[in-house]
UniProtKB/Swiss-Prot annotation:
Family according to the record: Belongs to the acetylglutamate kinase family. ArgB subfamily.
Pfam families: AA_kinase
Keywords, in A-Z order: Amino-acid biosynthesis, Arginine biosynthesis, ATP-binding, Cytoplasm, Kinase, Nucleotide-binding, Transferase
Predominant location: cytoplasm
Annotated EC: 2.7.2.8
Species this chain originates from: Caulobacter sp. (strain K31)
Cross-referenced PANTHER family: N-ACETYLGLUTAMATE SYNTHASE, N-ACETYLGLUTAMATE SYNTHASE, MITOCHONDRIAL
Reaction(s) catalysed (UniProt annotation): N-acetyl-L-glutamate + ATP = N-acetyl-L-glutamyl 5-phosphate + ADP
Name recorded for this polypeptide: Acetylglutamate kinase
């Protein structure tokens, strides 16, 4: 063994030893992971994510993956010649769009992630299980309504978003059954819900992750994004903030665009029983491991 290889071995051992207190903290705890962004479409990054999810399972953590798929849906709609329209960051979903969204989310993406996890965990028999919120009526949903002011009359008008929904009830029993099984399963959830009348709805993946994390009383919810975390007015990373500070960031306008719904869902999750939510860069290799098993973490932690 060369000196360089030997030093690398000692460094690895040191890292593992330093991680021991954190491994014990998360032993048999549920961690909900919102997996999305452009990194999800990169095969090498997807393989690293799957391997890290398997490692979490083998270290005693109960990971639950909720995935998005906006860019993939947009590409499929473009191929089908269906135009996409967005209101407040939500895709207006008519019948044709809903059919494509469910096919992409519950079919292609969901099964691909579950398969990567199963391949990564093959030697230890860790298996990814792909589900949508329709399975076992895990996610009961209702239609989302939005209003906006008419520029001419300044009157609030209802905007029809089509088959865009929001969770009204979460039944976590099927997930809990998988997590407590003798086989090491990792549930992978597509953000599709169903109404009490049987209507299918497309739901924002951040919203689903927050609702599931609350129902499962998860210790952590990790929101993997394309940025380092939440930034302050000067563009610097905020390492930790309270729910009150997160609200203030929204109200002041410092948080804008896609960060607003992420913060809103993080606030909702914490207020519904999740110990803390972390927004972090999912493009960085092993970001989840650094966040959970090191002193300083890897993103912005939001707690009470």
């Amino acid at each position: 063994m060369t000196d360089v290889a030997e030093e690398a071995g000692w460094a690895t051992a040191k890292t593992l030893a330093e991680a021991l207190p954190y491994i014990q903290i998360y032993d048999r705890e549920t961690v909900v992971i919102k997996y999305g962004g452009h990194a999800m479409g990169q095969e090498q990054v997807a393989k690293l994510f799957a391997a890290d999810a398997v490692l979490l399972k083998l270290l005693g953590v109960h990971p639950v993956v909720v995935h998005g798929g906006g860019p993939q849906i947009s590409r499929m709609l473009d191929k089908a010649g269906v135009k996409s329209t967005f209101v407040d960051g939500l895709r207006v979903t008519d019948e044709a769009t809903m059919e494509v969204a469910e096919m992409v989310l519950s079919g292609a993406i969901n099964k691909e992630i579950a398969n990567w996890i199963t391949l990564a965990g093959a030697e230890a028999d860790v298996r990814g299980v792909g589900l949508s919120g329709k399975d076992a009526r895990m996610i009961t949903a209702e239609k989302v309504t939005r209003t906006r002011k008419d520029p001419g009359s300044n009157i609030e008008q209802v905007v029809d978003l089509g088959f865009v929904g929001e969770p009204t009830k979460i039944d976590p029993h099927i997930i809990q059954a998988l997590l407590t099984s003798e086989t090491d399963y990792i549930p992978v959830i597509a953000p599709i819900g169903v109404s009490t009348e049987g209507q299918t709805f497309n739901i924002n993946a951040d919203t689903v992750a927050g609702a599931l994390a609350g129902a499962l009383k998860a210790k952590r919810m990790l929101m993997l994004t394309d940025i380092a975390g939440v930034l302050d007015a000067d563009g610097n990373l905020i390492r930790a903030m309270t729910v009150a500070e997160a609200r203030a960031l929204i109200e002041s306008g410092v948080a804008s665009g896609g960060m607003i719904p992420k913060l809103e869902n993080a606030i909702h999750a914490v207020e519904n029983g999740v110990e803390a939510v972390v927004i972090l860069d999912g493009r960085r290799p092993h970001a989840m491991l650094v966040e959970l098993f090191s002193e300083h973490g890897a993103g912005t932690l939001i707690s009470k």
